[in-house]
Amino acid sequence: MGTAYLSPEPGGKSFVAPGDKVAAGQTLLIVEAMKVMNAIAAPRAGTVKALLVENGQPVEYDQPLAVVE
Protein backbone atom coordinates (compact mmCIF):
# COMPACT_ATOMS: atom_id res chain seq x y z
CA MET A 1 0.00 0.00 0.00
CA GLY A 2 1.18 3.52 -0.74
CA THR A 3 0.17 6.93 -2.03
CA ALA A 4 0.26 7.88 -5.72
CA TYR A 5 1.67 11.23 -6.82
CA LEU A 6 1.35 12.48 -10.38
CA SER A 7 4.09 15.13 -10.14
CA PRO A 8 7.61 15.18 -8.68
CA GLU A 9 6.71 17.87 -6.12
CA PRO A 10 3.53 19.42 -4.67
CA GLY A 11 2.05 21.87 -7.17
CA GLY A 12 4.51 20.75 -9.84
CA LYS A 13 3.80 19.79 -13.44
CA SER A 14 2.54 16.23 -13.86
CA PHE A 15 4.96 13.62 -15.19
CA VAL A 16 2.49 12.75 -17.98
CA ALA A 17 -1.08 13.42 -19.06
CA PRO A 18 -3.52 11.41 -21.16
CA GLY A 19 -2.54 11.75 -24.81
CA ASP A 20 1.19 12.14 -24.11
CA LYS A 21 3.61 9.92 -26.01
CA VAL A 22 6.04 8.12 -23.69
CA ALA A 23 9.21 6.09 -24.08
CA ALA A 24 9.75 2.70 -22.45
CA GLY A 25 11.02 3.33 -18.94
CA GLN A 26 9.76 6.92 -18.74
CA THR A 27 8.32 7.87 -15.33
CA LEU A 28 4.51 8.00 -15.31
CA LEU A 29 4.02 8.73 -11.60
CA ILE A 30 5.51 7.94 -8.22
CA VAL A 31 4.21 5.86 -5.35
CA GLU A 32 5.32 6.68 -1.82
CA ALA A 33 5.48 3.67 0.48
CA MET A 34 7.04 3.82 3.94
CA LYS A 35 8.60 7.25 3.12
CA VAL A 36 10.33 5.85 0.01
CA MET A 37 9.41 7.32 -3.39
CA ASN A 38 9.17 4.63 -6.09
CA ALA A 39 9.05 5.73 -9.73
CA ILE A 40 6.47 3.87 -11.81
CA ALA A 41 7.78 3.60 -15.37
CA ALA A 42 6.05 2.99 -18.69
CA PRO A 43 6.39 -0.71 -19.56
CA ARG A 44 6.80 0.14 -23.26
CA ALA A 45 6.77 3.07 -25.65
CA GLY A 46 3.31 4.31 -26.57
CA THR A 47 0.60 6.81 -25.74
CA VAL A 48 -0.87 7.39 -22.28
CA LYS A 49 -4.56 6.55 -22.71
CA ALA A 50 -5.57 7.09 -19.08
CA LEU A 51 -4.28 7.69 -15.58
CA LEU A 52 -6.37 5.49 -13.30
CA VAL A 53 -5.46 7.25 -10.04
CA GLU A 54 -5.67 10.79 -8.73
CA ASN A 55 -2.89 12.76 -7.09
CA GLY A 56 -2.59 11.78 -3.41
CA GLN A 57 -4.81 8.72 -3.79
CA PRO A 58 -4.00 5.64 -1.69
CA VAL A 59 -3.10 2.66 -3.90
CA GLU A 60 -2.74 -1.07 -3.35
CA TYR A 61 -0.22 -3.64 -4.57
CA ASP A 62 -1.04 -4.82 -8.14
CA GLN A 63 -3.60 -2.02 -8.65
CA PRO A 64 -3.67 -0.72 -12.25
CA LEU A 65 -2.33 2.85 -12.26
CA ALA A 66 -2.21 3.88 -15.93
CA VAL A 67 -3.01 2.65 -19.42
CA VAL A 68 -0.28 2.91 -22.08
CA GLU A 69 -1.05 1.66 -25.59
Regions found by a protein language model. Give the residues of each.
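Structured functional modules or segments
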Residues: 1-69
